[in-house]
């Protein structure tokens, strides 16, 4: 990339900072949740919605981001994304109640949903095709550093300042990013087809209402009749989308995607698999802080080995899948992740804290292998004319399943916690133990889906071609 013009390199730096802000924010909040609960006068069992409100908003808004960038221009949308994300961060820091914080996180999510896909689109437009991979490697590197720094930085800020600072640090970075975007980034536009607003609204209502119904079943004031009504509305919205998308060339996601068996299996497995694995980044720091008295900073440090294991495994996952095949790798890593989850719980309950970093490192390795395999299995056999639509649907499903996973984790904590009157340390650990056992069972379930994957090892060379689009 040394032969690129200075202006292009500056534009890549802008995109890289956007990736960093978005990836940092997805992990920095986790270690601060118990402190937020105490400050806002809420039960820690309700704080999962701080994560869900952000991730669910990202899932809902993702389908519109690419169309908006083509229609309005990448500079205008990227600038808007940074401004919304920064304003959301400010409102998060100023929040005095949980409801205010949830609304601010949703505003952040609107910005976050546009930041990464529009950033990818920007790189495609400003960099020659032969240098695209090198440019994407450059701009995504800060996105890999964000999860590494996020938990420890969040714990450090909470312990030595306050939880408000995990949002305030976004403001100067966002201001600089917004100004440089206006000054340096060209406003590329493309001719677009008419946006499928009806399909977008049906999907948005279906996802949001079903997630709300799932969370409402935890005893948050919804009556059984209201929950049943929400479920009915959500199901009807999704069924209407399926009817709307039939033989509709303008549909957000073509139903032709599901004619490819590996896409259908991969998408179903990704949805079920990320529900289970999406619980872990939320539950682990909460488990360590509330169950065992770890400080926020110490709990954040414990997350670093998991990220390191994930990053290290990415270098050899292609060789592993090509050697053993998708079916064996996905079944083994799914069951392995369930076992590692039980190992983490057992190690913590026995008080072997010095072993926890090694267990978390192993968990990161297994999880990374499964993620990469799920992504590439889903996309590898799609025809070129459906690859972009399939990738967008996979991205949306990834965010949606993570929000459902965090919601279910909060539901399990509330369910087991409500069965105990006392709040001594032994009871708290018992509640977490039952929750962890349930999580391990949920994590193992997608193995039944992956067992149906064709044993086509000779086709696994496609992983090297599709991996870039699935990141």
UniProtKB/Swiss-Prot annotation:
GO terms for cellular component: plasma membrane. It is a multi-pass membrane protein. GO terms for molecular function: transmembrane transporter activity. InterPro entries: EmrB-like, MFS, MFS_dom, MFS_trans_sf, Multi-R_MdtD. It holds the Pfam family MFS_1. Keywords: Cell inner membrane, Cell membrane, Membrane, Transmembrane, Transmembrane helix, Transport. Its main location: membrane. CDD domains: MFS_LmrB_MDR_like. It comes from the Bacteria. Residues 1-11, 70-76, 125-137, 186-196, 246-262, 307-341, 417-430 are periplasmic. It is found in: Cell inner membrane. SUPFAM superfamilies: MFS general substrate transporter. Residues 33-48, 98-101, 159-164, 218-224, 284-285, 363-395, 452-471 are cytoplasmic. The chain crosses the membrane at residues 12-32, 49-69, 77-97, 102-124, 138-158, 165-185, 197-217, 225-245, 263-283, 286-306, 342-362, 396-416, 431-451. Belongs to the major facilitator superfamily. TCR/Tet family. PANTHER family: BLR6921 PROTEIN, MAJOR FACILITATOR SUPERFAMILY MULTIDRUG TRANSPORTER MFSC. NCBIfam families: efflux_EmrB, PRK10504.1. This is Putative multidrug resistance protein MdtD. It comes from Escherichia coli O6:H1 (strain CFT073 / ATCC 700928 / UPEC). The gene is mdtD.
């Amino acid at each position: 990339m040394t032969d690129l013009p200075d202006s292009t390199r500056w534009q890549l730096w802008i995109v890289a900072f956007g990736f960093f802000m978005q990836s940092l924010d997805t992990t920095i909040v986790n270690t601060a949740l118990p402190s937020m609960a105490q400050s806002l006068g809420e039960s820690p069992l309700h704080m999962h919605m701080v994560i869900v409100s952000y991730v669910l908003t990202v899932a809902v808004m993702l389908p519109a981001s690419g169309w908006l960038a083509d229609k309005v221009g990448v500079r205008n949308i990227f600038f808007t994304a940074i401004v919304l994300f920064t304003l959301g961060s400010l409102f998060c820091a100023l929040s005095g109640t949980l409801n205010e914080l949830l609304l601010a996180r949703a505003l952040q999510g609107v910005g976050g949903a546009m930041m990464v896909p529009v950033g990818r689109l920007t790189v495609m437009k400003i960099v020659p095709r032969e240098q695209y991979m090198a440019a994407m490697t450059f701009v995504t590197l800060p996105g890999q550093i964000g999860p590494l720094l996020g938990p420890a930085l969040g714990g450090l800020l909470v312990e030595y300042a306050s939880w408000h600072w995990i949002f305030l640090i976004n403001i100067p970075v966002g201001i600089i990013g917004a100004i440089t975007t206006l000054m340096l980034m060209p406003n590329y536009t493309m001719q677009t087809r008419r946006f499928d607003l009806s399909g977008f609204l049906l999907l948005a209502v279906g996802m949001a209402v079903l997630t709300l119904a799932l969370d409402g079943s935890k005893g948050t004031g919804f009556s059984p009749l209201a929950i049943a009504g929400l479920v009915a509305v959500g199901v009807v919205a999704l069924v209407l989308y399926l009817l709307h998308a039939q033989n509709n060339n303008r549909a957000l996601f073509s139903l032709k995607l599901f004619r490819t068996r590996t896409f259908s299996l991969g998408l179903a497995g990704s949805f079920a698999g990320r529900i289970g694995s999406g619980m872990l980044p939320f539950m682990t720091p909460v488990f360590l802080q509330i169950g065992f008295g770890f400080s926020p900073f110490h709990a954040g440090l414990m997350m670093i080995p998991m990220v390191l294991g994930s990053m290290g495994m990415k270098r050899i996952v292609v060789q592993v899948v090509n050697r053993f095949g998708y079916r064996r790798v996905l079944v083994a890593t799914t069951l392995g992740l369930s076992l590692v989850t039980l190992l983490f719980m057992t190690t913590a309950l026995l008080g072997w804290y010095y072993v926890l970093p090694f267990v978390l490192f192993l968990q990161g390795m297994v999880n990374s292998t499964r993620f990469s395999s799920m992504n590439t299995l889903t996309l590898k056999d799609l025809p070129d004319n459906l690859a972009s639509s399939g990738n967008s649907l996979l991205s949306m499903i990834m965010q949606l399943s993570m929000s459902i996973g965090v919601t279910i984790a909060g539901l399990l904590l509330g369910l087991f916690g409500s069965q105990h009157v006392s709040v001594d340390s032994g009871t708290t650990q018992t509640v977490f133990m039952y929750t962890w056992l349930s999580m391990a069972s949920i994590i193992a379930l997608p193995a039944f889906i992956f067992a149906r994957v064709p044993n086509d090892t000779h086709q696994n060379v496609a992983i090297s071609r599709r991996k870039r689009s699935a990141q």
